[in-house]
Amino acid sequence: MAGIDQLIINSAYREPTHHWKYDLNGQTFIREEGRRPAGYFIAGQGSNQYNDIGQFIELPLVNRIRPRVKAWREAGYPGVTGVTRKLLDHWNDKDARQYPFFYCQMDAIETLIWLTEAPDAEKVGIDIPSDGGAFRRLCTKLCTGGGKTTVMAMLIAWMICNKVTYPQDKRFTKYVFIVAPGLTVKSRLQVLQTGGDDNYYVQFNIVPIGLMDKLHQGKVMITN
């Protein structure tokens, strides 16, 4: 089986321009242009070869959302609130912190903001299925080491700062409930509490100084 001569082919801080695709028949990896399509692999009934990665199942909804979010980003985030714009400008400011946020982190929070704040005309044909419950459920996915807790902090800051500024806007909330899958994770997520200086909002400069007082008016509860 032919291997990969250059494993890292993209910058962690920009949208991927290429990806590796595995060809089972040729038992080789092919470098293809563009971002890897969203999807997952499942083992087929005849998948007993050690090098058979299984059947690829595309996530068409995600692949429709991605170019919409990209176009919205490049257009300057039309439709967002003043608070959201301040946060986005702050997060995109390369001089605001030693290390910029990863592309996957910005893409995740931008997608959630787009689904919530972008004009309805931009979301025609994008229907997020409901599970029938009382709450709207949205999901983002990041790999191990991708900075999921940081994205959670960005999400919390976006919600709380908007709700405090626009208390009548039902799209936002200043109360955050986090359920952790165990005591260890619960302990690690204490960095999402908004009080004090030993939190991610301060460590990663997620909230500009002018919005910090608004963040402190929110309440975060973490349990397991």
How would you label these PLM feature ranges?
Residues 1-224:
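RecA-like P-loop NTPase motor core of helicase/translocase proteins
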